């Protein structure tokens, strides 16, 4: 069963605080489960202000995800400590710098920080070492400080702790991040709402522009206007045959004479990503060949979404997508021969070379997927999630079929594969470029609900474009 996030009252949820304390407790529980009797503190640092290497401008700031997960704090130059034994969290914020106030205004105060973020105490970063020393000296013998490797400032000392563990904290946060709580899902619903509307706006403009970069500007402008200033990743705005390049970067080609546009773009809300792809006809009407491919990909997505629920093996769903792709490509004549033999030969990888999807959260390719990029089976090598899906996880479902010369030509030259590909029929489809459809799904006990509301029905998209 699939429902849509439009029915989620996420705005009410977002009026509360980001549940940082509960995240810290979950991470602590994981560590204690791995290390019974663990005593000590978790210690993290947010991202520091950093200038570009050859001038006095600051680099664009993005908070460290591990730090944000335990604090909800987007400020630069902050530190954090969580006392495992006392269940007490402390956020350290930069003290007031009078010289900085002249240029940037007053920073967040201690009292404001206490009101804004879900932490038990707030101090200045000038108190970090003294606080660590005080807490460490009160701990029993064998206490530990748990921190992230290569993310501890030289000026910070852990002298009062007997042990320093730089491995398990990263593992603990990455595992606990897989299952989202209600607040995290509300953030992602917000990001999806803004981004879905942005995709629709691009559909409305696609007939009226000449270059891909103009459509990138439409999407970015909409996100910024709605408060989503950061993008989860570099947008892919690929027209014509460029859509066969999975992570197309330039976004600056003229679109005259091309059939379709593939838009893979997602805004970010409070450090959480959306990741949405739509493919639609530039002139408002799919060609016969484009519509055939689109219908195959839409069927791949719909049937894979219908197969999802808690405990489903993601590898099996990816395999299902390939089976549907093979059936569709056989029906239109691009593939020929026995479908089971085609599946066994992995010839369908020529047209669907990537994994079906990935976990989504603070990172676009979020933690916990356990991929195996050394897999000798080419069908599964780029599958970013391996294993069973837990309820509360968010995963993208993004099947695609692509006509990329660089990928397909070696298959045409290999007798093992070429016997299953009708090159004469294939010739009619190169200009389709590539079709991908991507939604963001929350896994539930009995099914899913879809955070993504961007139009994907082919007739609806054609109507939006034609009436714009």
UniProtKB/Swiss-Prot annotation:
The keyword Protease applies. Coiled coil: none annotated. It catalyses: Release of any N-terminal amino acid, including proline, that is linked to proline, even from a dipeptide or tripeptide. Mn(2+) 2 binds at residues 264, 275, 438. CDD domains: Prolidase. Binds 2 manganese ions per subunit. Mn(2+) 1 binds at residues 275, 398, 438. One of its GO terms (molecular function) is metalloaminopeptidase activity. The keyword Manganese applies. Its cofactor is Mn(2+). Belongs to the peptidase M24B family. Catalyzes the removal of a penultimate prolyl residue from the N-termini of peptides. This is Probable Xaa-Pro aminopeptidase NCU11288. It comes from Neurospora crassa (strain ATCC 24698 / 74-OR23-1A / CBS 708.71 / DSM 1257 / FGSC 987). The lineage of its organism: Eukaryota, Fungi, Dikarya, Ascomycota, Pezizomycotina.
